[in-house]
Amino acid sequence: MTISQYFPIYDQLDKADQERLDYAAVKRRVPKGTLLHGGDGVCTGLLVIASGQLRAHMISEEGREITLYRLFERDICLFSASCIMSSLQFDVFISAEKDTELWIIPPDFYKGLMERSAVVANYTSQIMASRFTDVMWLMDQVMWKSFDKRLAGFLLEESVLEGSVGIALLTTFPKY
C-alpha cells in the first residue's frame, strides 16, 4: 500500500513531485481514541486516510463538543495542516473514531507542493470548499432544526456508520 493509491491527484503530479511525496509522506497506524491534532498550535500536517475513521470536532470552553465532519478511506484532512493557510484562525481537533491507517504529509512539504503545482492548489481549494459546505450544513442543523429531528438524524447516521439496524444505548444497567 502506497500513498499513490490514496492521494487522488497523485497521477497529476510531475514525476519529481511524486518521488518527493513518496519520500516525505509518513505512514502511521493510530488506535481508536487517539487525538491526532489538538488545536494546540502544533501543525500536524495533511492527513491522507487509508482506512478507518477520523472525526473533526471543536470543543467549547465549557468542554462541550460538536462534530464538524467525519473522514473515511481516501479522504484528506486539511485542517490538521491549517498553519499553511494563514487565514484559518480556529482550533479543530482530529480524533480517531476507529483504528486508522493514514499518511501524514508534512505541512512545509505540502505548502511547497501547492506553490509549485496549480493542480495541488486547485485540489486544496476544492477540499476547503467541501469542508466549508459540511460546516454550513451543520450550522443549519444546529440553528434551524428541532432537537428531535437532529437526534433522529444522528441515530440514523450512527446506525449507518456502525453498519447496524439498531444502536446500543446502554451496554450495562446500573445496580441500585
Q: What spans do the regions from the language model cover?
A:
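Cyclic-nucleotide recognition modules
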Residues: 70-126
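Short helix-to-loop capping/linker segments positioned immediately adjacent to catalytic or ligand/cofactor-binding
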Residues: 91-92, 111-115, 134-144, 161-165
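N-terminal positioning helix adjacent to the helix-turn-helix/winged-helix DNA-binding module
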Residues: 143, 147-150, 154
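Phosphate-/nucleic-acid-contacting segments
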Residues: 156-176
